[in-house]
């Protein structure tokens, strides 16, 4: 059974179980972090795959095969094989077997890459990429300079988003689709993410309506309008995300790795 914890309360050091001298596994340029029980970060694997929301961990966890595998593995090991941590450094962390199965669900080629990397990590064969020659060292220095330049450019481009986050506490509610544009996300992507994470209702006549707990917390407002048609009356729902909700959701998206934190320039 998947459990959720608050990362700030339950993990004093996300890499507590890892020897500081040991190189963490890196796949496609993404560091695959672990929790102190040695479970692997599925969100990091998703980022390494380079694929969209349809291959996110939440989608895999909905499949019958994933549920059955988790149940059997937890019976066998007598431990929690998959957990979710909220807050800084959070995410969904899973037993190595589950992480490899998730990678296989993404693609067979990705499974092979992940499995070999985990084997190298477990057996201590994982080595940092140290330049072996002057040209390699120069190439590494150039790559680091390019990365620094790209980050600086992104900070300049994203500064309005950060300033927006500082203003929204007192702002009136906005439509979710408009908020997605402000964040630089696709409207459909944000709605899918909100449904996958249990914030919006996923099916039925109230699809895309916030669940009551999030309305009660003051994150959303809901307006119901009765519309008369030739086929009778129907209810239309208009959802707005409040200033409080905008700050809360931005933090959730940052914690999930959907948004990348940047610093505002003055």
Swiss-Prot record:
Protein encoded by which gene: kilA
Signal peptide from the UniProt entry: none
InterPro entries according to UniProt: Ant_C (IPR005039), KilA/APSES_HTH (IPR018004), KilA_N (IPR017880)
UniProt keyword Ribonucleoprotein, yes or no: no
Protein known as: Protein kilA
Molecular function via GO: DNA binding
Function: Not essential for vegetative replication. Either interferes with plasmid establishment after transformation or is lethal to cells. May be related or lytic development of P1.
Source species of the chain: Escherichia phage P1 (Bacteriophage P1)
Key word Plastid present: no
Disulfide bond positions: none
Keywords: DNA-binding
Residues of the DNA-binding region: 176-195
Domain KilA-N span(s) in chain numbering: 21-121
